[in-house]
Amino acid sequence: MKFFIDTANLDEIKEAHSLGILDGVTTNPSLIAKEGIANREDFIRHIKTICELIQAPVSAEAVSTDAEKMIVEARSLAAIDPHVVVKIPMTIDGLKAVRQLSEEGIKTNVTLVFSPLQALMAAKAGATYISPFVGRLDDISADGMNLVEEILEIFSNYLFETEIIVASVRNPLHVLAAAKLGADIATIPFKVIDQLAHHPLTDLGVERFLKDWEKVEKQRV
């Protein structure tokens, strides 16, 4: 399974990249705003910097809601760097845009997917990736990972090449469940990536080894 990081923070991206586990980045308007980016020029520069850092897929979102405007915006985003993947919302206009962009060879990530039928429509329209939001479904007492399982079954039935990005990941259990189901990708906040690497027994083991080694060193003196 591939790991993307869900952030626009350069320090977080650099740190995750240094671990040797990073396969891509996803951003959204909220994450961009969190970095204090206030104009189009700075946004373009920021996305280009991320692409140069990791040389891997970087999702940048089109904020238009009309299909024609989405297409124009997507072309502009795709021109930033060959690694840019354009995030398109799962709407009727979004599907129209995805179809056209697919024909032009522009990679797309259909976001805000909450049902298997939405995922099916996005795949048929030619989406490169689809992003089911598991955490938001869990928030309303639905089963986010069940959605992923249903999408995987449908895509397997019809051999769709569209990859599934498990999004809205809130904790390590979401990542574990995604991996067990066979999802292509999980896009993970930096905090959760950090949690994946830790276990209290590992920490205790390291501490014990160090204490035992100190005893050996003292005996040698």
Curated annotation (Swiss-Prot):
Organism domain of life: Bacteria
Lineage: Bacteria, Pseudomonadati, Thermodesulfobacteriota, Syntrophobacteria, Syntrophobacterales
One Pfam family, short name: TAL_FSA
UniProt xrefs under NCBIfam families: fsa_talC_mipB (TIGR00875)
GO process annotations (BP): carbohydrate metabolic process; pentose-phosphate shunt
EC identifiers of the protein: 2.2.1.2
Active site: 87 (schiff-base intermediate with substrate)
Name of the protein this chain belongs to: Probable transaldolase
Pathway: Carbohydrate degradation; pentose phosphate pathway; D-glyceraldehyde 3-phosphate and beta-D-fructose 6-phosphate from D-ribose 5-phosphate and D-xylulose 5-phosphate (non-oxidative stage): step 2/3
Keyword Cytoplasm found: yes
Compartments, record wording: Cytoplasm
